[in-house]
Amino acid sequence: MANAVGKITQVIGAVVDVQFADHLPEILNALETNNNGNRLVLEVAQHLGENTVRAIAMDATEGLVRGQTVTDTDGPISIPVGNATLGRIMNVVGEPIDEKGPVATDETRSIHQEAPAFAEQSTSSEVLETGIKVIDLLAPYAKGGKIGLFGGAGVGKTVLIMELINNIAKVHSGFSVFAGVGERTREGNDLYHEMIESSVIVPDNLTESKVALVYGQMNEPPGARMRVALTGLTLAEQFRDQSGTDVLFFVDNIFRFTQAGSEVSALLGRIPSAVGYQPTLATDMGAMQERITSTKAGSITSVQAVYVPADDLTDPAPATSFAHLDATTVLSRAISELGIYPAVDPLDSTSRLMDPQVLGEEHYNVARDVQGILQRYKSLQDIIAILGMDELSEEDKLTVARARKIQRFLSQPFDVAKVFTGSDGKQVPLAETIESFKAVVAGEYDHLPEGAFYMVGGIEEVKAKAEQMAADAA
């Protein structure tokens, strides 16, 4: 049967109503029309009655007119998948946007897939080493797990996700997928050029590239921002099922997925829920997050940045994502104001791997001791603010001194932030991190000044910096 053809009856911003004479397209079907020479894809969202469907546009609708013909593709949005997508940048509907010609593959896959069945899923408790001290020690990531980076505006989510790409994706033997969801175009451009510089993308020989990029940035209509995370996820699923290896899936930013869903929901006339979000918030998030999973064929390790509106972790959008994650790294404005980067909150960040049977007794005990000292320092801060340090007992003074050293030792220079800090990035092996913090907690370095612990890698650098500081002071 020939594909059904309809006519546009109404255009309301990113929402388009299309009337079909006989055969109505199904919900989630992709419709196509020609907008001034450009292919415009619409996705069916509602059946309105009288043979009319309401669809969401995946690109700008300026130029559409009533009466214009629209064709039903008879299936959901499908994108090119497989090795031909490596080294390429695609948009939400799988069109290349890197000016390197079409994606050379006939293999396509619908962006709407069922989550793997319960029997197909697999879990692992293997630690994914990142080389970042505060993460490896206090909230370790699981291979094949879901990781969330939570933070307000400007506390360093994107820098941290870039550093994780730098540390993990470069040494990672499998494939990576990066989905830029509703973030700055400049950051997407910077990331692309950084990947070329570090040979993760090889422009002259794309088959040697290890990453596929999918962008739906801030300037795109809400339909594109709502669906681009699914486009990236579809690529990652295909790599997992085809290669059977561990696929890395980076999303920046998952909040924009929710935000776009809220815009679309309002355009479709649904009654808003708490704080103006869509009533289907938990369903939308669950449908996507359940697909990001490890199966017996291979695994997906996902790192998702989550913007926290007004630094409020109880906002429905970040609160809904918490339930789906294996590890949460919370970035704190108070810590970033101290100049400590990465501004990870060591007391708020969590991981399901925080268990002596997974990490081993030594790692677990050191992590808990570090958190214990920091927690004691936090509870003493009110007393210090009112009465000053002199009113503390000798034991508490020692706790505060160690806590301040630990706090500074949890900072670390990043490769991707070299342009801001002027110092080379450092990666610290997990064994060295555990050993160093064990010694600091035990008081072996009580004689060193706290300034020596700031923005360094391992403990040897602390000693060298302390000597340098002593020499400069002499």
Curated annotation (Swiss-Prot):
Q: How does it sit in the membrane?
A: Peripheral membrane protein
Q: What does this protein do?
A: Produces ATP from ADP in the presence of a proton gradient across the membrane. The catalytic sites are hosted primarily by the beta subunits.
Checking NCBIfam families in the record gives: atpD
Descriptive protein name: ATP synthase subunit beta
Reaction(s) catalysed by this chain, per the record, are: ATP + H2O + 4 H(+)(in) = ADP + phosphate + 5 H(+)(out)
Q: How does it assemble?
A: F-type ATPases have 2 components, CF(1) - the catalytic core - and CF(0) - the membrane proton channel. CF(1) has five subunits: alpha(3), beta(3), gamma(1), delta(1), epsilon(1). CF(0) has four main subunits: a(1), b(1), b'(1) and c(9-12).
Listed A to Z, the keywords are: ATP synthesis, ATP-binding, Cell inner membrane, Cell membrane, CF(1), Hydrogen ion transport, Ion transport, Membrane, Nucleotide-binding, Translocase, Transport
| Single GO MF annotation | ATP binding
| EC numbers, comma separated | 7.1.2.2
Assigned protein family: Belongs to the ATPase alpha/beta chains family.
Give the UniProt entry's GO cellular component terms. plasma membrane; proton-transporting ATP synthase complex
